[in-house]
Structures are given as structure tokens and as C-alpha cells.
Amino acid sequence: MVIKNAKFVISVADAKSLYNTEASEIAIAGKSNVGKSSFINYICNNGKLARTSGDPGRTRLLNYFEVNNGEFFFVDLPGYGYAKVAKGEKTKWGAMIEGYLTGSSNLKNVFVLLDIRHKPTDDDKMMVNFLFHYNIPFTLIATKADKLSRMQQMKNRQMLASEMGVGVENVYLTSSLNKTGKEAIFDRIAQILG
């Protein structure tokens, strides 16, 4: 599996008007400052594909990215758990995320991004419990691996697996800064697309 090209297609503000990709979709979920945009840009080898920002909570829409001329799509979900957002806005995002996850007939897997430096938040656990409850396949991806020593990476990978109730082999380590973890992610995508 290699990503040759990727492009932004559309933003959707409401789960009632989901974009029909007519292709497999992999959703990207995670808390607001976990590095979802950086992950998409790194995996797709395009630093300008998804807008990155030091301002958490920037993604407020479902953003669709077409990969390899429609072989599959990444769908970037709004980041959850951002404190500086009005309660009404958070409720709207929650409904949009839930509506997409339960309403997209093309969704094949959800990449749940976690910051390897920290224990999963209650919001992270709520997301994974939601996916378990609705029997939606997911993959845990630990971002920002460059921030820790190799030994600390292994220790924290084990901690994330334990906290989230999955085997350690189901936690993938990545660093968009050090450009590591891409091959394992490509292998995972190939598995998902079958």
C-alpha cells in the first residue's frame, strides 16, 4: 500500500448531509490537540493537505480527503474535548461525530489518535466505548512518538493498550516530525481495505 496522491474534496457541517464517497472511508478521530491534521499530512505526504493550527479545536466540520484517485477517503472528524468551546457547540460537534459514525455506510475503520505522552482522557475512553458499543472497527494510533525515548515509547504504548482494553500490537506509534510509523500505517490501511 502506497499513497500516491490525496486531495481535499469537501467539508460537511451536518451529519444529515453526509458526502457519498462511493468508496471505503477511514475516519480520523481524536482530541483537539492530538495532531490529526499533521497525521493526515504526514501519511499523505502533503504538508498542505489538512490545515494545521496551534489553535486547538479548529476542525469544526467533517473534512473529506480523497486518496489515490478515490481508492479510499480519509474523513477528519472535529476534535473532541476542547475546553474553550461553548457547550452548545460541543453538543453540536458530538451529534455530528455520532451521526457520521453511525450513519456512513462506507465507514470501514476509525483511526483514534492518542498523544503517547499522556494517559487517555475520559473523552478518548468514551470514543472507544462508543465504537465498541456500535461494533465499529477502530485502530489506536499514538502520535508524537518523537517526544519520548525509545524505552519510554514502549512503556507508554503498553500503558495506552492497557487503558484502552486492546492488545499492544493494536497501538501504532507515529511521529510526523521524525517521519516514523508510516509503513505500519500503510500495512494497516491495506488490511482494512482488504
Where do the PLM segments sit?
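Conserved nucleotide-binding/hydrolysis micro-motifs of P-loop NTPases
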Residues: 58, 72, 79-81, 117-119, ...
